[in-house]
Amino acid sequence: RLPNGICCNGRQIRTIDMVQFGDEIVLTDCEVPSTLAPSAAAVPVLGETDSYIVYNKPAGMPVHPSQGHHGDTLGNVFAAQFPQLPFRPVYRLDSDTSGICLIAKSAYAAGQLQGSTRKTYLALVCGELSTGGTVDAPIGRAEGSVLCRCVRPEGKPAVTHYTPLRSDGTYTLLSLRLETGRTHQIRVHMAYLGYPLAGDRLYGTSSE
């Protein structure tokens, strides 16, 4: 609760208090500065307004700081550009996934943008897939691992829709849409079907 965060006619009130027509409402806009270490890494900016900025995140860059990644994330890049703002990604992408990341510049913008996007992914999988489909299989943490996920009955609901775009018989390019956002969801679901992502050392085979 901020001092004088919401005032009605000069008097501080709560969000649950009633107001009347004609009351003067004043909101204090107080953003907490970023606590992330700034990074000078160059990440392409696809667009920017007063409310948000859109980055083209490269593969290999985490969105959030985590164990082993304290200064090389998209959050650190944002902190270098906007040290006075907290880092508010509207959604996240896995570290190994490249693509568009939308970052809100205020709590209000984050609320307005939440759920307003529809993401489509492209993935190259091993094997030939001629028809599309849907994988509706729960995903949970693999036994004894802090990193790997797998399909397991007690996992969280996860739904992936996939459509083949092109295949040379050895690999297939897929367009995918997710109804949920579980960690490694595309990688886990495609490996579960028997079509792991090409080059995926975690869920593919050693020869891929």
Regions found by a protein language model. Give the residues of each.
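RNA pseudouridine synthases
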Residues: 1-208
